[in-house]
Amino acid sequence: KTIRHAVQKMLPDFSNPRGAEVGIQIDWFQNGKTTQLRIEQLSDGYRTTLAMVMDIAARMAEANPDMPDPLQTEGVVLIDEVDLHLHPGWQQTILLDLMRTFPNIQFIVSTHSPQVVSSVKPECLRVIDWLDEQPRLIPVPFSEGAEAQQVLLDVLGVKSPRVEQLEIVQKLKKYQQLVD
């Protein structure tokens, strides 16, 4: 019951995850029609997100069997590369969706996605840089609502928004120099 509730909150188009003869099945509601799917038929992004949500919910239910709503459990969850396999649009909402589904959980996540970074307040971010084999925290002046290119340059430390090694980029750079 807790797992089903978590899946429904996190992914409203999906419901009723259940064991089947072969693996796990889930119902997908789209365009007024429900389709039964095997987990294997879903994209890696949906599979990893469903697995993560079902795992967190199962652990909450197991740790609090007498709690009326185990999704209200307090705790800390670590997630490495929370954006892994997710479409950029979903990367923008994954943390908000997780916090809505598990409101009393503190999520500690790693990411290299400007989409994820731009969904978080700067005071909640820790950018770690390694200098001389020592970790160093870099202050983040802004993040929430920032454009991806700005996050890449100013938060994630990407040197250029373009792939400088591409011939077309080098030609464009040369053209701009000639014009200037």
Summary of predicted features, one role per range:
Residues 5, 96, 100, 173-176:
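Surface-exposed alpha-helical segments enriched in charged/polar residues
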Residues 1-8, 152-155, 160, 172:
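Coupling/switch segment of ABC-type P-loop NTPase heads
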Residues 23-163:
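Switch/communication elements of ASCE P-loop NTPase nucleotide-binding domains
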Residues 1-31, 179-180:
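Coupling/switch/interface segments within P-loop NTPase motor domains and analogous charged loops
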Residues 164-180:
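C-terminal alpha-helical "lid" subdomain
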